[in-house]
């Protein structure tokens, strides 16, 4: 479930597959009526067979904890079903006791931790000025101490930034302090906000799996259709899919296998003409993404030293 409008976030990560955040915001409020979001969850539950849904996840086209009624929505959703509820978060607001209390209702929380130092945090995540590294680590540590659910920390590895032995050791030291249940290593395999962002090479991956602890594993992008192929209009189904993240054309067709590849291809072409979809070329692959997403086109500013913090 997406509780905030597109790119409503207090970070502007260089690797974000939804493009740049402009402007960055740190305002907590009810961006959408909570009852509307809960009603959409109920509708989705009613339209699927038992066993179709493994998790209900508040993931957001930005930062879910910016919705000030997140805790209430989690509790209301849990009252509807026995399906576990998860929340992905950049954990920048966990220093606030009320945010920790809201997330404590979830069965699993997936915070991001991409850096072991303030300097690298600011270089990769480009946070709102009030979202300091010290607050992030303090909040995450305090949340872990009180949280009874599953804590799975996500680390996005970027070539030349946080894939060195030194950078990974700094992250590992914080992971040892926080003691998550698992560490999920992710790679920027979809179009990132900045074109110079690349996944690490073999050496960086070897360092990561060796240094980040026994609970660390590399996870790939989700490939399920999330039930969106049940929608009646192929164009709206395509928009719903690519609004979550950019997808290669073949992925869109697999996700929407209710329609023929020709029907999906024609829908993509119409959406591009109408300005509702855009083509993003990255890593030699042609991706389709949301027309609202804004991707960088230039090279990274800064010295070689800054690229290997």
Where are these regions (language model features)?
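Glycine-rich beta-strand-to-loop/alpha-helix junction loops that act as flexible
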Residues: 57-63, 90
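Auxiliary Fe-S-binding modules of radical SAM enzymes
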Residues: 163-309
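Phosphate/pyrophosphate-binding loops at sites that engage ATP/ADP/AMP, CoA/4′-phosphopantetheine
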Residues: 43-51, 176
């Amino acid at each position: 479930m997406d509780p905030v409008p597109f790119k409503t976030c207090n970070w502007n990560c260089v690797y974000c597959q939804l493009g740049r955040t402009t402007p960055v915001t740190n305002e907590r409020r009810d961006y959408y009526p909570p009852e509307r979001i809960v009603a959409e969850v109920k509708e989705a539950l009613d339209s699927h067979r038992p066993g179709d849904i493994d998790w209900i996840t508040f993931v957001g086209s930005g930062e879910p904890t910016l919705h000030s009624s997140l805790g209430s929505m989690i509790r209301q959703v849990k009252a509807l079903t026995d399906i576990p509820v998860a929340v992905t978060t950049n954990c920048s607001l966990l220093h606030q006791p009320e945010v920790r209390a809201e997330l404590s209702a979830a069965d699993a929380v997936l915070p991001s931790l991409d850096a072991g130092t303030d300097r690298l945090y600011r270089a990769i995540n480009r946070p709102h000025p009030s979202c300091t590294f010290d607050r992030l680590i303090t909040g995450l540590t305090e949340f872990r101490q009180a949280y009874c659910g599953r804590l799975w920390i996500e680390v996005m590895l970027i070539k030349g930034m946080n894939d060195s032995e030194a950078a990974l050791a700094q992250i590992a030291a914080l992971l040892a302090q926080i003691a998550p249940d698992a560490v999920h290593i992710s790679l920027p395999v979809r179009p990132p906000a900045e074109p110079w962002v690349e996944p690490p090479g073999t050496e960086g991956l070897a360092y990561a799996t060796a240094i980040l602890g026994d609970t660390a594993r590399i996870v790939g992008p989700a490939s399920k259709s999330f039930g969106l192929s049940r929608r009646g209009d192929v164009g709206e189904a395509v928009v719903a899919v690519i609004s979550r993240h950019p997808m290669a054309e073949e992925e869109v067709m697999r996700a929407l296998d209710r329609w023929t590849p020709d029907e999906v291809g024609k829908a993509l072409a119409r959406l591009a003409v109408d300005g509702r979809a855009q083509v993003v070329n990255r890593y030699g692959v042609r991706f389709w993404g949301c027309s609202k997403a804004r991707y960088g086109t230039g090279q990274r500013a800064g010295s070689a030293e800054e690229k290997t913090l």
